[in-house]
């Protein structure tokens, strides 16, 4: 047998071993109906595994145990092996989105099912298999390299699919207060599109939301001079807002975009001018524009149109995350090399998509990259992931650890 055939045979055996271990742990996690913000015991499973691998595990609870909704208590897991730098941290979430009507699923969403080459379950792609893959990768890595350089950590929350106020952001605040720094962060979100590893996210756009309230004066449609129509007052300003050019983007980010997602007004009667209008819009912005610049330009537009209006406007702003970017460097290179070694793919860097918990970690100075399974079915009925990708992903993750923590 040639050296090439020996290497290929060894790689196939490694993938098979990783695949079964990752599949088994994935199923154990997927059986838990951990609809946000309920972890439902997933982190206990991980803590037990990681403790056996030499990790110090710490549960962090934030929020009100008696509350419901966005202020409910959230369980988070911080696990670390090693006390030196660099620190490579895997960030993930055990919570999942609701299933919708389970009758629409081919297989029960919390009964993991293998069929047609896929593992079907809520959370299969987003993102319990990613957590399982990195856990297996870390176990194998520390078993083979017990004296490795640096440290390996896990930051796992059950508040990523919800309001994200008592999860990763609070854990990061605690770590910062302890001067416990993350050097490299690998977020296990499903980044791949057509094939495993074809895309990794080395940044994300910022997200700035706004709720516009326009207040006029209610009246009869036949007597507009006795009323002030908030719809008419808002229309021109909103039109200019949607047609404005905020920036031209750059090599890493597309131009900043704005989308109006909701407009609501009216009294239910066809002959009444309403008193108020509410509009909801969102900016996805690049590093070429700041939060303050977007707010200032928006207010300038509305101030101009409302200067001579009897109506008044107010905007309530909510920043969900600043844009962040990890330039090509050690972490990006480690990911690209590991992907190439396992799949033969030349990966593409991207900053597209929505926000992730990476937005809370990047401001600490950490390099942040998102790498996970394909995202074709996330948040959908019949969410699924290719079984063959599980072992490959674990092997990629292990390769990243080797690239960063071995001399």
Swiss-Prot record:
Note accompanying the cofactor annotation: Binds 2 Zn(2+) or Co(2+) ions per subunit.
InterPro entries named in the record: Bact_exopeptidase_dim_dom, DapE_proteobac, Peptidase_M20, Peptidase_M20_dimer, Peptidase_M20A
Residues annotated to bind Zn(2+) 2: 126, 161, 379
EC class: hydrolase
Reactions this protein catalyses: N-succinyl-(2S,6S)-2,6-diaminopimelate + H2O = (2S,6S)-2,6-diaminopimelate + succinate
GO biological process: diaminopimelate biosynthetic process; L-arginine biosynthetic process; lysine biosynthetic process via diaminopimelate
This enzyme's EC code(s): 3.5.1.18
MF terms in GO: acetylornithine deacetylase activity; cobalt ion binding; succinyl-diaminopimelate desuccinylase activity; zinc ion binding
Names of the cofactor(s): Zn(2+); Co(2+)
Stored Pfam families: M20_dimer (PF07687), Peptidase_M20 (PF01546)
Pathway membership: Amino-acid biosynthesis; L-lysine biosynthesis via DAP pathway; LL-2,6-diaminopimelate from (S)-tetrahydrodipicolinate (succinylase route): step 3/3
Active site: 95, 160 (proton acceptor)
Alphabetically ordered keywords of this record: Amino-acid biosynthesis, Cobalt, Diaminopimelate biosynthesis, Hydrolase, Lysine biosynthesis, Metal-binding, Zinc
Metal-binding as UniProt keyword: yes
Domain of life: Bacteria
Residues annotated to bind Zn(2+) 1: 93, 126, 189
Family label: Belongs to the peptidase M20A family. DapE subfamily.
Record function comment: Catalyzes the hydrolysis of N-succinyl-L,L-diaminopimelic acid (SDAP), forming succinate and LL-2,6-diaminopimelate (DAP), an intermediate involved in the bacterial biosynthesis of lysine and meso-diaminopimelic acid, an essential component of bacterial cell walls.
Subunit structure: Homodimer.
Name this polypeptide is given: Succinyl-diaminopimelate desuccinylase
Encoding gene per record: dapE
């Amino acid at each position: 047998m040639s050296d090439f055939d020996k290497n290929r045979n060894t790689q196939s055996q490694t993938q098979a071993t990783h695949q079964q271990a990752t599949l088994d742990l994935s199923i154990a996690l997927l059986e838990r109906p951990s609809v946000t913000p309920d972890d439902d015991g997933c982190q206990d499973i991980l803590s037990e595994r990681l403790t056996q691998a030499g990790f110090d595990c710490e549960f962090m609870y934030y929020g009100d145990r008696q509350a419901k909704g966005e202020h409910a208590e959230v369980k988070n897991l911080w696990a670390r092996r090693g006390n030196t730098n660099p620190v490579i941290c895997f960030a993930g979430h055990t919570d999942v989105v609701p299933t919708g009507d389970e009758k629409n699923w081919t297989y029960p969403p919390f009964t993991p099912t293998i069929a047609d080459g896929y593992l079907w379950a809520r959370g299969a792609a987003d993102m319990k298999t990613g957590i399982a893959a990195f856990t297996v990768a870390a176990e194998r890595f520390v078993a083979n390299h017990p004296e490795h350089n640096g440290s390996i950590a896990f930051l796992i929350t059950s508040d990523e699919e919800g309001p994200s106020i008592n999860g990763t952001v609070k854990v990061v605040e605690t770590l910062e207060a302890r001067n416990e720094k993350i050097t490299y962060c690998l977020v296990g979100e499903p980044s791949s599109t057509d094939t495993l590893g074809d895309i990794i996210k080395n940044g994300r756009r910022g997200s700035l939301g706004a709720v516009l309230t326009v207040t006029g004066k209610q009246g009869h449609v036949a007597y507009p001079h006795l009323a002030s129509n908030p719809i008419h007052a808002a229309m021109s300003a909103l039109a200019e807002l949607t047609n404005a050019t905020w920036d031209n983007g750059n090599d890493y980010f597309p131009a900043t975009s704005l989308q109006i997602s909701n407009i609501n007004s009216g009294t239910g009667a066809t002959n009444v001018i309403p008193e108020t209008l509410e509009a909801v819009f969102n900016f996805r912005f690049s590093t070429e524009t700041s939060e303050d610049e977007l707010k200032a330009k928006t207010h300038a537009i509305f101030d101009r149109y409302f200067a001579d209006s009897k109506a008044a406007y107010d905007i309530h702003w909510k920043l969900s995350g600043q844009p962040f970017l990890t330039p090509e460097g050690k972490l990006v290179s480690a990911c690209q090399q590991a992907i190439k070694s396992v799949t033969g793919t030349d990966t593409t860097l991207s900053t597209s998509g929505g926000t992730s918990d990476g937005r809370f970690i990047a401001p600490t100075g950490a390099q942040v990259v998102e790498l996970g399974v394909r995202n074709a079915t996330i948040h959908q009925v019949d969410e699924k992931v290719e079984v063959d990708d599980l072992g490959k992903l674990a092997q990629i993750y292990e390769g990243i650890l080797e690239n960063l923590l071995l001399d």
